[in-house]
Amino acid sequence: MLDLQELHLAVNDTFKVLPTPGLLLLSNDGTQKNLITIGWLQFGNLWNKWTVNVFIRLSRHSFKILNNSEYFSLNVLAPQKYINQINLCAQTSGRNCDKIKESGLTIAENSETKIISIAEAQTVFECKILNKVMLDKTNLSDDLHKKFYSNDDFHQLITAEILNIKR
């Protein structure tokens, strides 16, 4: 069971780095690991669970990995200290390089949940995927479609339960 005070502090830490880069999602499908920057997310309570919604575009390498995963971690990094690593993850595709190796960031594994995270992160949300919904032209307003999806590179909305927080 999550401690609500800890959840409040962790969410507050997260919003201190947004909308500037500083939030990395680490996915692992058992054969591949990948880091991707996250700019759009929501925290809340759904199905009597503390949850986070993340949005991943279909064109992203992490899309395939997340669709074959049960868990992921959200890692809050201090942008001032890790700007080069964050920029690498934002500007490079995991199809073309091993972003974890190239960034020099260290992978940590929770011995109980086996969820991997970034050791250097100031806050980590360990998450279990509950639901995936594809956004498309039929479920978006015309305004949103024109502004964010004119090339039809839609997001998948992934709802995940927050299992654990490390700070």
Regions found by a protein language model. Give the residues of each.
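Active-site-proximal mixed secondary-structure blocks
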Residues: M1-T37, Q42-R167
